[in-house]
């Protein structure tokens, strides 16, 4: 069927900010879809609130709106643009829910807008638990016994009927939000109450637990002519009971017999046909390991995280083809872009194994609840490709960037047997490493399978890895066992550990004996047909399929898995760098390990190597490709950390040199550089042990800011108020040593701002200065940032520009750099310099219209700013005001404290743009799900040192019609200053009148809570904050953010005064 000609303009709804459960995979899907629709000649209008995406670049769609994805703003855009249709199936749960809302509000009918891809009725049937159950019964597809409930009592009654354990699944939520497994009535009451609150339709499904079954996923496609195919099937290493986003996954399935595979394949195709989905769809099934019994768990009627994984695992571009199907094209008339010869109707075949391992944020959240269940907790994931399970699993382990390079964590050798077993039974994020440790201790795989219900086949692979370790230990220097270990994915470093030599020595032994990897192509057809994709993975076999081209090449290192502190912003910069390399006439090669991102789409670069970002893996590619050099500036700390070992091995690092990177990162060298350049910084010292730290702090004076050197995202950074707290920090938070000193700085309470600059060594272009709303002490990634600055004097801005130029030239910076300043009493101090692209690059690029990463890349390759038509100095400001606001995923992470401080906690960002600061702030708050009504109740519970300031805020809230509630000390202070506040209790003093009770009752519109001493973990405060998060009540832990919210409310209200 040819494409439709009755529609001309299509709106694509994006997925908004990155949160746990909805990450970069939707930037990849949305970008593909917009380009595919443009390719077919349609006019595309894109709405998305996340500036850190490639999708929101001007060239991706005909019109790009970076606006909140709320009914208010999407309706405005619909009325203005009048599209013929909306494609909502590529914006994750956000896009789907928005489409449903627009439809229910009658807006689509009123404007005559059609929904493409999947009909509303199908979305309802897949997402509404009741309708889904009905459909499965009609299709005679088995589902676990279940019941839909709208109250906690109904849930308890049903569970009593079928018996525990049961699973709670709220309707229309993302990534299992609010759901969970309940072993008894107490757990059920707690989880069901929370789930009903988080479900937009106050509905949950209570179902019999089938934990322990194999969890299998099928990624299927269907078109309007009812052609349907399976793109990829996947098997979870972890059985049912752990969210698939938190499970290790292998593709294709590994333990199914042909009969089982056909049975589940038929079920999946039957379901997609019954739902009449046009596009991609993901079906999750549970299979009894001891019989042919299976259950359908759920269906996602849209492109999902699994679709991104399936696309990268097979090379089959699901989102691109789904977009074309939505406008009427069929699978048998579209060419598969990977082979360029076969049609899209051809099911992919794999001659390799793909492993995906989730990346969790618990390195940032010491107190977080690490136990895994049906609610997703991972922020990102890595994927690795090998010719066997062992190889792909070990490559994935070393891609995680959690300080391991094998399926082993050395510190687990100190764990007792009892603790080891407990951790294996109650799965946490690091269970793979506990299982491997148990095998090393001699536990049998049968015992472990009984404890975990993980298939013996997978545990046998872990045993095989251990057997190779044992053999390596017995045969030091043996070439045959070296070959065997490399064929099974062992890193040189691991072999070196066992053989008690250096990794360099192992590498030399390998190269001397010609044990080098070959690169195989991902071609969707198991090499059956000629294929044109330049998409490769390494393995230790014979024939090499990656041929070095005649053209000179440049390698760009990506940023690996998405985690807190290193998000999709770095992928954005990577993709732009590649474009500039290609424009400059070089071949652009990307190395990365993240399946969710645009950079690992094989059509972005000239060659893609899907490999771990470690010295060994990168070096292997460099030896094959012999590039002009490597660019490390755009891959965050991941790539920067590789600069030194690569340079040491003789590789050319393009842009800022390693010695200069060191001058910015090494504390003593940096201090010296600032002294030489005559630039002030807060007084500080380095300490290599506890006593030195205490001596430094006494000299500087408390409060001090303490942190380890060489980190990203403010890891283990704290503001410390006293000597006792400092001692406690030195003992618990860091492992200080002469190699890893701790920095002790005077903590200046001032306003903070930052600059991204681009330098060619002579001239320095400063696109703009971003002013932070929260004062120093809140990590820059968690602060709201405003461009152009609203309160900085012209003199301060001129000083910032002057210091930026001095630093860029003084540190010999070629390319990008990011500098953070604090301003106190009109004096500008430099806090830190990062000689690389930072997380603000996409935001600043968009608001100034300067393609920063592309310009930086051209400078790195030898151009000058003058040649490119840019002047030295600060670029003229834009007319509009732009606000970048952070977005957090606390609802997904139990026991993580939402208090803001110097350690970064946000997972994503949104942007608001308008003619005034207040309007831009309003949009930024709306886009980040901080919605405050015009009146209501606000609770203040404030630390002594901020009560004065809080009083002024409370008065302003009161003036616009809010009622003020406060805890005892705060209420007393307010009363002494003539502001009446209703007294509420903190916790448990009076259960009907404490803060959690108010929060549960829905009577509170916001909570403002500040804390004095951050070191003493205050359980009351943490419980108050977590009750606000659980019930979706806006929570402000920085008074500056609350001040911004009051400004918005004031600007939207009218004054009513008696004369």
From Swiss-Prot:
For region Allosteric domain, the annotated ranges are 930-1059
Q: In which pathway does it act?
A: Amino-acid biosynthesis; L-arginine biosynthesis; carbamoyl phosphate from bicarbonate: step 1/1; Pyrimidine metabolism; UMP biosynthesis via de novo pathway; (S)-dihydroorotate from bicarbonate: step 1/3
Which residues bind Mn(2+) 2 per the record?
A: 298, 300
**Keyword flag Cell membrane:** no
Q: Where is this region: Carbamoyl phosphate synthetic domain?
A: 547-929
Q: Where is the ATP-grasp domain?
A: 133-327, 671-861
Leader sequence residues: none
Where along this sequence does the record place binding of ATP 1?
A: 129, 169, 175-176, 208, 210, 215, 241-243, 284, 298
Residues that hold Mg(2+) 1 according to the record: 284, 298
EC class of the enzyme, as a word? ligase
Record's keyword terms, sorted: Amino-acid biosynthesis, Arginine biosynthesis, ATP-binding, Ligase, Magnesium, Manganese, Metal-binding, Nucleotide-binding, Pyrimidine biosynthesis, Repeat
Protein residues bound to Mn(2+) 3: 820, 832
Region annotated Oligomerization domain sits at: 402-546
The role this protein plays is: Large subunit of the glutamine-dependent carbamoyl phosphate synthetase (CPSase). CPSase catalyzes the formation of carbamoyl phosphate from the ammonia moiety of glutamine, carbonate, and phosphate donated by ATP, constituting the first step of 2 biosynthetic pathways, one leading to arginine and/or urea and the other to pyrimidine nucleotides.
Q: What is known of its domains?
A: The large subunit is composed of 2 ATP-grasp domains that are involved in binding the 2 ATP molecules needed for carbamoyl phosphate synthesis. The N-terminal ATP-grasp domain (referred to as the carboxyphosphate synthetic component) catalyzes the ATP-dependent phosphorylation of hydrogencarbonate to carboxyphosphate and the subsequent nucleophilic attack by ammonia to form a carbamate intermediate.
What is the name of the protein in this document? Answer: Carbamoyl phosphate synthase large chain
- Organism of provenance: Streptococcus mutans serotype c (strain ATCC 700610 / UA159)
């Amino acid at each position: 069927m040819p494409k439709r000609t009755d529609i001309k303009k299509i709106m694509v709804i994006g997925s908004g900010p990155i949160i746990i459960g909805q990450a970069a995979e939707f930037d990849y899907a949305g970008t593909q879809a917009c380009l595919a629709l443009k390719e077919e000649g349609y006019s595309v209008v894109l709405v998305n609130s996340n500036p850190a995406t490639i999708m929101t670049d001007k060239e991706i769609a005909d019109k790009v709106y970076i606006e909140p994805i709320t009914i208010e703003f999407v309706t405005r855009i619909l009325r203005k643009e009048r599209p013929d249709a909306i494609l909502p199936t590529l914006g994750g749960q956000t896009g789907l829910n928005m489409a449903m809302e627009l439809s229910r509000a009658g807006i689509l009918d009123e404007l005559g807008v059609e929904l493409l891809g999947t009909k509303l009725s199908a979305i309802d049937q897949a997402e509404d638990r009741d309708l889904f159950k009905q459909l499965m019964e009609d299709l005679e597809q088995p589902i676990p016994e279940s019941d839909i409930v709208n109250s906690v009592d109904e849930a308890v009654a049903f569970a009593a009927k079928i018996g525990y354990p049961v699973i709670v699944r709220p309707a229309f939520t993302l990534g299992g939000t609010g759901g969970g497994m309940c072993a008894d009535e107490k757990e059920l009451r707690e989880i069901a109450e929370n789930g009903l609150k988080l479900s937009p339709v106050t509905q949950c499904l209570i179902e019999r637990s089938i934990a322990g079954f194999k969890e299998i996923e099928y990624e299927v496609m269907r078109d309007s002519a009812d052609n349907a195919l399976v793109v990829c099937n996947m098997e979870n290493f972890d059985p049912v009971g752990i969210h698939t986003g938190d499970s290790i996954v292998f593709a294709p399935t590994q333990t199914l017999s042909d009969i089982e595979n056909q049975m589940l394949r038929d079920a999946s195709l039957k379901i997609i046909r019954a739902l009449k989905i046009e596009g991609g769809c993901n079906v999750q099934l549970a299979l009894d390991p001891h019989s042919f019994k299976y259950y359908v768990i759920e269906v996602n009627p849209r492109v999902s995280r699994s679709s991104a994984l399936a696309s990268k695992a097979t090379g089959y571009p699901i989102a691109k083809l789904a977009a074309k199907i939505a406008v009427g094209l069929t699978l048998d008339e579209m060419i598969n872009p990977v082979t360029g010869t076969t049609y899209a109707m051809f099911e992919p075949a794999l001659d390799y194994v793909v492993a995906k391992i989730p990346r969790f944020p618990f390195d940032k959240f010491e107190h977080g609840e690490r136990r895994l269940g049906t609610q997703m907790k991972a922020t990102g994931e890595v994927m690795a490709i090998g010719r066997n399970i062992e190889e792909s699993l070990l490559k994935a382990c070393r891609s995680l960037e959690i300080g391991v390079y094998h399926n082993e964590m050395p510190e687990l050798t100190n764990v007792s047997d009892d603790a080891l077993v407990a951790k294996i039974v109650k799965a946490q994020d690091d269970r793979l490493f506990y299982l491997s440790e148990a095998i090393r201790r001699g536990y049998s795989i049968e015992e472990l399978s009984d404890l975990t219900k993980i298939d013996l086949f997978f545990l046998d692979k872990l045993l095989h890895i251990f057997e190779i370790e044992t053999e390596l230990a017995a045969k030091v220097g043996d070439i045959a066992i070296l070959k065997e270990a490399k064929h099974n994915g062992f890193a040189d470093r691991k072999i070196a550990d066992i053989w008690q030599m250096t990794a360099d020595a192992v590498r030399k032994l390998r190269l001397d004996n010609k044990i080098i990897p070959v690169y195989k192509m991902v071609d969707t057809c198991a090499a059956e047909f000629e294929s044109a994709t330049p998409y490769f993975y390494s393995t230790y076999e014979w024939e090499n399929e990656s041929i070095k081209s005649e053209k000179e090449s440049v390698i760009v290192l990506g940023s690996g898995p998405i985690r807190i502190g290193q998000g999709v912003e770095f992928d954005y910069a990577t993709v732009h760098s590649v474009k500039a390399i290609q424009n400059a006439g070089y071949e652009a090669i990307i190395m990365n390990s993240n399946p969710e991102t645009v950079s690992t789409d094989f059509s972005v670069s000239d060659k893609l190597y899907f490999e771990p970002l470690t010295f060994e893996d990168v070096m292997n590619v460099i030896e094959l490709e012999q590039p002009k050099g490597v660019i490390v500036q755009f891959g965050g700390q991941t790539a920067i950390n590789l600069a030194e070992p690569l340079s040491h091995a003789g590789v050319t690092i393009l842009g800022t040199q390693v010695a200069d990177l060191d001058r910015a990162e090494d504390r003593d060298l940096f201090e010296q550089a600032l002294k030489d350049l005559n630039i002030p910084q807060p007084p500080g010292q380095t300490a290599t042990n506890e006593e030195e730290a205490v001596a430094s702090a006494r000299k500087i004076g408390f409060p001090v800011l303490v942190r380890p050197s060489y980190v990203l995202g403010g890891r283990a950074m704290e503001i410390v108020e006293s000597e006792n707290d400092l001692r406690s920090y030195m003992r618990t938070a860091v492992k200080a040593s002469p190699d890893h000193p701790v920095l002790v700085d005077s903590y200046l309470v001032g306003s903070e701002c930052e600059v991204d600059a681009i330098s060619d060594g002579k001239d320095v272009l400063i696109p703009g200065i971003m002013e932070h709303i929260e004062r120093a002490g809140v990590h820059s990634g968690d602060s709201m940032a405003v461009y152009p600055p609203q309160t900085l004097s012209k003199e301060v801005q001129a000083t910032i520009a002057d210091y930026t130029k001095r630093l860029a030239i003084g540190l010999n910076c070629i390319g990008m750099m990011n500098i953070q300043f604090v301003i106190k009493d009109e004096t500008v101090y430099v806090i830190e310099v990062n000689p690389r692209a930072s997380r603000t690059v996409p935001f600043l690029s968009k608001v100034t219209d300067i393609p920063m990463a592309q310009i930086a890349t051209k400078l790195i390759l030898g151009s000058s700013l003058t040649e490119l038509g840019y002047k030295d100095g600060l670029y003229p400001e834009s007319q509009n005001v732009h606000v970048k606001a952070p977005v957090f995923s606390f609802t997904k992470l139990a026991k993580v404290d939402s208090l803001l401080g110097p350690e970064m906690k946000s997972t994503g960002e949104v942007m608001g743009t308008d003619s005034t600061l207040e309007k831009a702030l309003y949009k930024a708050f709306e886009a980040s799900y901080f919605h405050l009504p015009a009146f209501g109740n606000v609770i203040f519970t404030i630390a002594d040192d901020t009560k004065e300031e809080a009083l002024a805020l409370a008065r302003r809230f009161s003036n616009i019609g809010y009622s003020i509630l406060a805890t005892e000390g705060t209420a007393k202070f307010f009363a002494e200053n003539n502001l009446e506040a209703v007294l509420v209790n903190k916790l448990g003093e009076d259960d009907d009148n404490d803060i959690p009770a108010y929060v549960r009752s829905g009577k509170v519109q916001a909570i403002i809570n500040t804390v004095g001493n951050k070191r003493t973990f205050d359980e009351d405060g943490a419980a108050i904050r977590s009750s606000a998060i659980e019930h979706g009540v806006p929570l402000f832990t920085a008074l500056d953010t609350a001040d911004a919210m009051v400004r918005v409310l004031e600007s939207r209200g009218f004054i009513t005064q008696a004369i």
